[in-house]
Amino acid sequence: VKLCTIWSAEARDEEGHPVRDQGSVSYSAAIESAATPDASEVRSEFSERVLRETSRRRFCQAERTVVIGDGAAWIWNIAQELFPKAIQIVDRFHVKQHLSDLAKALHPANPAQAKLWAQERFDQLDDGKLAALLGALRPFMKSTTNSSDEARKCYHYIRRNRHRMRYLRFRQMGLCTSSGVVEAGCKVAIATRLKRAGMHWTVLGSNAIIALRCCILSGRFEDFWERRSVRQEAA
């Protein structure tokens, strides 16, 4: 299942951090492909879905636009194709999870040391010290242990996406750096309805329920039935 979530975050919490504006979240999701054949001018199914939802929400008319996702290349391919002027941000907690997993691989017998090492990397990440962070990872790439592969993957993941990890600058700009709203949408719109005990779904059936859930959670349920009624009368 692929999910597109749109929200605004002009509100601030007590510490001045951006929080989503109440009632601003909308969802659109389905089991469909995000892949586009090489040299094809036809957008993928999911790209078209994203374009419909962003058009509906007038995303491109906003003063500032941001695309938040994990490090998956297909997300950034869609973002670059559809919204070349949007700021791209890798979810900060995804990056920290990668660093935490690496810390455990580097110090499997010493959880306290792993936690300390990870926290030092977190601080470098949050403070915008990406060069220092990459420098701290580099020596472990040359080791002969199994953790060298993990270190190499983490290093290249951060290096490849470093322009999307300028979290100090993003915070100064008042931008969200977490995709928590998207993660919550995956749970509320998808998992709690489709992943109950004993359930089995066809793609057609699951997509129908997903569409219905997204309509309800996006506050478009009544609009959906009104449009359906108009189409039936026109037919």
Where do the language-model regions lie?
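Catalytic center-proximal scaffold of phosphoryl-transfer enzymes
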Residues: 1-235
